[in-house]
Amino acid sequence: MLSQYKNIQVSVDGSKEADLAFSKAVAIAKRNNATLEILHVIDTRSFQNVSSFDSAMVEQVSRMKDYQARAVKAGVKDSHYSIEFGSPKTIIGHDFPKKHNIDLIVVGATGLNAVERLLIGSVTEYVTRTSKCDVLVCRTKEIANALEK
């Protein structure tokens, strides 16, 4: 029997993979008449000063409003966006899903933080290994083609 998802989380960071994940999450939310939670996590370890943090915050609020407008335009009846601060792995994989009763997390195969991916593993890998709910990992055609070679 197929799952009927009620609360879907999509994590976005501005990458192509995140945009693909967003599109798939919108389709799933619409098909299931589910709530769509659009999440962006600002990794506070990457900021050197307050002014760079403030400008990033303004940019992210605008981007998140755009994502939510796209979801509404596509027919998602209940959508929200959140900007959280801290460790993306922990927030995406545990804290946010628990707080919002998420039953499906949709993420891109890779994100923008290449340094963290090299040093300590990707957020996506961590989420798929440790999350308590279903996780859908979305790959762009370029990544899928590269994996076939």
Regions found by a protein language model. Give the residues of each.
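Small/aliphatic-rich secondary-structure junction motif
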Residues: 2-54, 74
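Short, well-ordered secondary-structure micro-motifs
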Residues: 21, 48-51, 91-94, 117-118, ...
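Hydrophobic alpha-helical membrane-association signature
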Residues: 21, 60-63, 123
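General small-molecule cofactor/ligand-binding pocket signal
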Residues: 37-39, 80-84, 136
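Acidic, proline/glycine-rich short linear motifs
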Residues: 39-65, 144-149
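Structural beta-alpha unit
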Residues: 73-105, 144-149
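Gly/Ser-rich helix-loop-strand patches that form or flank binding pockets
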Residues: 98-146
